[in-house]
């Protein structure tokens, strides 16, 4: 599962 890391 790929999710946009909150950077």
From Swiss-Prot:
The modification Pyrrolidone carboxylic acid is found at residue 1. One of its GO terms (molecular function) is peptidase inhibitor activity. It is found in: Secreted. GO terms for cellular component: extracellular region. Expressed by the venom gland. Keywords: Hypotensive agent, Metalloenzyme inhibitor, Metalloprotease inhibitor, Protease inhibitor, Pyrrolidone carboxylic acid, Secreted, Toxin. Signal peptide: none annotated. GO terms for biological process: regulation of blood pressure. Belongs to the bradykinin-potentiating peptide family. This peptide both inhibits the activity of the angiotensin-converting enzyme (ACE) and enhances the action of bradykinin by inhibiting the peptidases that inactivate it. It acts as an indirect hypotensive agent. This is Bradykinin-potentiating peptide 7b.
